[in-house]
């Protein structure tokens, strides 16, 4: 039985939402033996998890993660009746990459359970909040962090180009905050205030804010 606590932009520049550095590598995933019609086979636990309709969003959100996630989801989305479990542990990353993942999740007709395992920060929090209502779960000691997008390092040039970058960043901020408002039930003014700083929330606070629905200790 699941243990739960109920709580109540599109730009041309590569924008990031900040966050700590994590690499997207699963080279150390162990293998297990499985009995098949052709005999005993050794398979990666990631392959085994995908067979069980489990997908992982771990690490920095970038183009490589989008590619991996899209390939897995397109395979699973062919079955619109069976649940998909998505586990997220991400410090954030590139906005455009994150919005691609967000859009893919929104387009999925299959029921999706979303689990925050450790951290959903920055763009990761936007993706997590965009999970299906009533199916967004967070572990008791996991954290969520929301904030404004960050200007990419090295941005410079003429006054006009800097102004153009600033305008694009404001559009991105508005787009991300509108997504958060849509999925949390907060009005846009509340979200604007909440994202003015690195706003860290524990599991219960994330439920209260509307980013997720349940605190759980059951990942199945």
Question: Residue locations for each model-derived region?
Answer:
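Terminal-region recognition feature
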Residues: 2-220
